[in-house]
Amino acid sequence: MKGLLQRVRGARVEVAGEIVGAIDQGLLVLVAVEPEDTREQADKLLHKLLNYRVFSDEQGKMNLSLKDVGGGLLLVSQFTLAADTRSGMRPSFSTAAPPALGAELFDYLLQQAQGQHADVASGRFGADMQVHLVNDGPVTFLLQI
């Protein structure tokens, strides 16, 4: 399971012109599910997302987590993040989970996040989404669980 987290000042996801998820300051996370992923990996990713110290303290050091700052968490499914890009001129998606497994684990991750954090939003699994964000930093990390 991969999570590409971006520290944002604000972000929103639209589907067919309708805003389906939005946050103010916090983390936008693009989530890719791979074929061998499990709920245990989703739990580990969520723990890391909520506790990873990517926000600055009073001294300007990245020492505060999403929980510490009370920021929003916007989860967006993105199977292309799991692509194999090592050869050729076209990405291969054989390393991405089948849609049913991807949807199951993304929904599980979202439900767990909503139970553990106050401000959680999401895109719509499998939809053609437009993601709008204001990067803060920019600060971007690829988490692989």
From Swiss-Prot:
Short motif (Gly-cisPro motif, important for rejection of L-amino acids): ranges: 137-138
Stored InterPro entries: Daa-tRNA_deacyls_DTD, DTD-like_sf
State where the protein is found: Cytoplasm
Q: What is its EC number?
A: 3.1.1.96
A GO molecular function assigned to this protein is:
tRNA binding
Q: Which domain of life is it from?
A: Bacteria
First-level EC class: hydrolase
Q: One Pfam family of this protein, by short name?
A: Tyr_Deacylase
Keywords per UniProt: Cytoplasm, Hydrolase, RNA-binding, tRNA-binding
Q: What is known of its domains?
A: A Gly-cisPro motif from one monomer fits into the active site of the other monomer to allow specific chiral rejection of L-amino acids.
Provide the assembly information.
Answer: Homodimer.
Describe the function of this protein: An aminoacyl-tRNA editing enzyme that deacylates mischarged D-aminoacyl-tRNAs. Also deacylates mischarged glycyl-tRNA(Ala), protecting cells against glycine mischarging by AlaRS. Acts via tRNA-based rather than protein-based catalysis; rejects L-amino acids rather than detecting D-amino acids in the active site. By recycling D-aminoacyl-tRNA to D-amino acids and free tRNA molecules, this enzyme counteracts the toxicity associated with the formation of D-aminoacyl-tRNA entities in vivo and helps enforce protein L-homochirality.
Spell out the family assignment given in the record's similarity comment.
Answer: Belongs to the DTD family.
Can you say what this protein is called? Answer: D-aminoacyl-tRNA deacylase
Q: Which organism is it from?
A: Pseudomonas putida (strain W619)
